[in-house]
Amino acid sequence: MSCIQTRAILQQDIIIYGQLDNVKNVLQKAIKHKYGRRMVSIVPIMNTVIPQPAVAECFVTFGCEKIKKRLLCLDTAAFMRYNYMRETCPPVYCFFLEPLGGGRDLMYRIGIDLGGTNIAVGLVDESMNIVVKQSMPTQAQRAPELIVDDMATLCRRVAAEKGIAISEVSAVGIASPGIVDNATGRVEYANNLPFRKLPIADMLKSRIGELPVHIANDANAAAWGEAVAGAAKGSSNSVMITLGTGVGGGVIIDNKILTGFNNAGAELGHIVISAGGRQCSCGRLGCWEAYSSATALINMTREKLEECRIKGRHTLIEDIANERGKISGRTACDAMRAGDEAAAEVFREYVYYLACGLVNIINIFQPEVISLGGGISNEGDFLLKPLIPMVRKEQYGGGIVPETQIRIAKLGNDAGIVGAAMLK
């Protein structure tokens, strides 16, 4: 097994041991961990003989982006095996072709989570951690140009807070509500923002300089964030479901965001799970969102409370609602924890319909991981414990093929920022 040993020779050196045909892989990890985006030269040291290296190409990976670098290195392990008749190579000496430049060897990206209420912007390092974050109100009724002005201002602020110029950022990503087209950099339509065929990427570039600017739907960006840095990290195929006011979704297939031919794909909240069922906010009947959103859980709780009042049945739902002044997504869960049977009935119904939608998603996409985000996901294991067995019971091929892992999302409200920053 290869190992990496770092050594401070002029503060620019790495020593790598291992099979030569694994040098590229080991070197990627060494550069990513230690030195950011610097180009290196690799020269094998064999006693006093230093053969002339050939020019090859290598991919140095930072998070999800592969940055192509030309490296001076041995072409293949065949040279070593042919000349030295052995499988392993001696240490490989690496040195930088350019100075470190004041230690700023890290790669930063900026992620913008644009919402109808707030604009949140974060500076993200190569480990996909948000190192600086700032926000301001969107004031969605304003002209789009003013909203983009504020996005640019926040980009400059987060860079300045870290002590770097905006020009030193490698890329910027925007997570926007609505139908967006990354190929053109446009928001085609957004329901809660005054955007119609808005060339938002070019508008932002004109304000911050000619940096690469990528764009994705906000739910897709959050799914991408969980895929690269959250609950689904390490998987190539994953789905994120957000259980909030509505049900949002994003699908990652073979490490790519599924958008559909018209950039309106993965509207998972509007798959129909009960024909002619509950009214959805979209105007249709029986959508998953009408059964599995936080709004749906609140409606179910209210209906159960009214039923209990009619039947003269006491329920802790009423006590908790009176104490807090309202019914929320937590009301039924908290009452159930306290042993209330009416609340348990509500929660079982909610989990049943949530499982129905998840089974459909698994049967269609067969993702390695489904991550659950949004307010309801804060229930954690209290939600997962009854949910997972119900899904396992109904999914096709359950117990025979490898099973999809259902997890609570890790990044919370930062998923959109991280996902936007790591767009490509």
What are these regions (language model features)?
Residues 2, 6-8, 30, 77:
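Short linear motifs in low-complexity or flexible loops
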Residues 3-8, 13, 17-24, 35, ...:
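ATP-binding/phosphotransfer module of carbohydrate and carboxylate kinases, centering on a glycine-rich
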Residues 22-24, 28, 35, 41-48, ...:
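Short, positively charged and aromatic/hydrophobic N-terminal segments
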Residues 50-52, 56-58, 64, 69-73, ...:
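Short, often N-terminal, low-complexity regions
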Residues 113, 173-177, 216, 240-246, ...:
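Short beta-strand segments
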Residues 134-136, 191, 261:
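Short hydrophobic alpha-helix segments
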Residues 191-197, 214-220, 240-243, 407-413:
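Active-site nucleophile and cofactor-binding loops and adjacent substrate-binding regions
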Residues 264-267:
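Structural signature of FAD isoalloxazine-binding scaffolds in flavoprotein oxidoreductases
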